[in-house]
Amino acid sequence: MPKTEETVLQNDPSVAENGAPEPKTPGQSQKSKSFCLDDQSPDLIETVNEVSKLSISHEIVVNQDFYVEETILPPNSVEGRFAEAMYNAFWNHLKEQLLSTPPDFTCALELLKDVKETLLSLLLPWQNRLRNEIEEALDTDLLKQEAEHGALDVPHLSNYILNLMALLCAPVRDEAIQKLETIRDPVQLLRGILRVLGLMKMDMVNYTIQSFRPYLQEHSIQYEQAKFQELLDKQPSLLDYTTKWLTKAATDITTLCPSSPDSPSSSCSMVCSLPSGAGNNSEPPSPTMVLYQGYLNLLLWDLENVEFPETLLMDRIRLQELAFQLHQLTVLASVLLVARSFSGEVLFRSPEFVDRLKCTTKALTEEFISRPEETMLSVSEQVSQEVHQGLKDMGLTTLSSENTASLLGQLQNITKKENCIRSIVDQWIRFFLKCCLLHGMQESLLHFPGGLILIEKELAELGWKFLNLMHHNQQVFGPYYAEILKHIIHPAQAQETDVEPN
């Protein structure tokens, strides 16, 4: 039996990057084959199912763009060619059965059974009359009897199914169903029906997600806490990595000094507003400050380190994406600061010029992490040309050969991690994110670091994503963090006793 077009979760990392699940080597296939859930204990299967439910619920709540979409395998890929060959083989077999004398309806009956189940799954709870009608018109036993007597009218049933689909489908599928109505070949028609029904099931899933999202958001904290507690009861060591993560955060925060680069002088107004223990290492850190330091450390996480905190595993991909965006913003802001120092304020007062320069730099720095030297060579040349043309268009004095060479050199030096400008920008950005956690976005924007004003929009967007994600995590796992931190920070020394979000 062929399956209808499969769907996948949009944020499945194995699909999001390549458009299809990553192919496995023969060794990997054998290994994955040996680990079959059917061969595992019921407890393990139950745990996997619970984790899956928790992950999907969490995804719906924290990702407003979450939806299910159709998987389209690349036509020239091994998977694509294999799937197409298997589908064609089945439909050719169905055609042979229907054309045989007398006709063989074995496969057709199985297809009609699948169609019936799919149609019933698309009905809403109160559509009982339509449910009874489908049950009667596509009664499996009755169809089987008709097939045995050679009286199964496949074209008539297909037209009936098309009418039902037109009644039940979302407007976006009207055109697809109209095209099906023009198909006269019964095999091609059934094939088209199965495909569009698969899309309609996907539409129903997305409609359900959209409808239930407000309810899930209202009850997500309690639900995630309850599910995690169930998992913790079965596996008491489930917080081991979380404990290590918070222990490191406590160590990091006690070694910071208020005069260190982590508190840029240009943001002194924000330092003054930090709670006790936030910027003075002579006092013990508060549990909340330790937790926020831990959150910030996630943006520096080594991808090779498998000891990722269990309480944040569901957000690991999102945090990696935020870390990449942070890195890209650091490079972007560094480039803009260097370019402005050479071209002057007048040119950078032009929103059109700044937007054009930002767009160019963003596009060229996509591969900065993997090819830093080559990337910055391209960036330096392009930025130099943009600055030269911008000054010329505004009737300003263009850069001399000496200044142009210096501009190129300073831009290319951004490649180095120890580059002064890049280091300062990185510290400003992280300090801004820390203040977002402590004081919220609105207050943090009032004290926005002047050196980052050219990326205020992009950084504010990053800050919102990071703040909302960590706020939800703190609401769910705050009680667990508080319990762990009691053993890391002595209660008599701690500045506070809980880690509830502000």
From Swiss-Prot:
Listed GO biological process terms: protein kinase A signaling; regulation of sperm capacitation
One term under GO cellular component: acrosomal vesicle
One Pfam family here: Tcp11
InterPro entries linked: Tcp11 (IPR008862)
Coiled coil (residue ranges): none
Top-rank taxon: Eukaryota
Span list, region Disordered: 1-36
Record family assignment: Belongs to the TCP11 family.
Protein's recorded name: T-complex protein 11-like X-linked protein 1
